[in-house]
Design a protein with these regions (language model features):
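C-terminal domain-tail junction helix/linker
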Residues: 40, 62-66, 87-174
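RNase H-like DDE/DDD metal-dependent nuclease/strand-transfer catalytic core used by mobile genetic elements
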Residues: 1-114
Length: 174
């Protein structure tokens, strides 16, 4: 949630608890959280759709020692980040016609790759979700600050050599 990185996704023909479990299994495998001892177990934030309130999913979550948090009914803002992702994805994906499920799946795969690794997010200080997820954000922002400082120093140095600008600067200082 904090990085907006899409860990796992699946194109399903149904909205069943088994589909949710399958996607969660992919996420667990990707992160490796099932192979190491973690301080904070992952949690699932979802709406109140039938697949999320089923006993089957509750048992699955309990067996994985994962917490399930549901948003307030009729309050999609609780899941605002993923709702925004879905809107962005639909705006891109709906531009094409897909005649076979594999075509749609291929396009979704390309979109997730772009979203995670190439699309800068203003809310993430203009880095990608992958940069945040893999812990590169601080280093990137520090490098940007360093470049900005050097650029400003260089501009100042060059402007002081320019007779027109240095006279204006002198007049302003008086």
């Amino acid at each position: 949630d904090f990085s907006r990185f899409i860990i796992a996704w699946e194109l399903c023909t149904t909205m069943a608890a088994g589909d949710v479990q399958s996607t969660l299994n992919k996420a667990i495998t990707f992160t490796g959280v099932d192979r190491v001892k973690v301080k904070h177990r992952p949690r699932l934030l979802s709406d109140n759709g039938p697949c999320y309130v089923s006993n089957q999913l509750a048992e699955y979550m309990e067996s994985r020692e994962m917490k399930h948090v549901r948003g307030a009914p009729y309050h999609p803002m609780t899941q605002g980040k993923i709702e925004r992702y879905h809107r962005t994805m639909k705006n891109i994906v709906k531009l094409q016609h897909y005649y076979f499920p594999w075509e749609l799946e291929q396009e979704l795969s390309k979109f997730v790759e772009h979203y995670n690794h190439h699309r800068y997010h203003e809310s993430l200080k203009n880095v990608t979700p992958a940069d945040v997820f893999y812990g590169r954000q601080r280093k990137i922002l520090s490098a940007r600050d360093r470049i900005k400082r050097k650029t400003m120093e260089e501009r100042r140095r060059l402007n002081l050599r320019n007779p027109l600008i240095s006279k204006v600067d002198t007049i302003v200082q008086i």
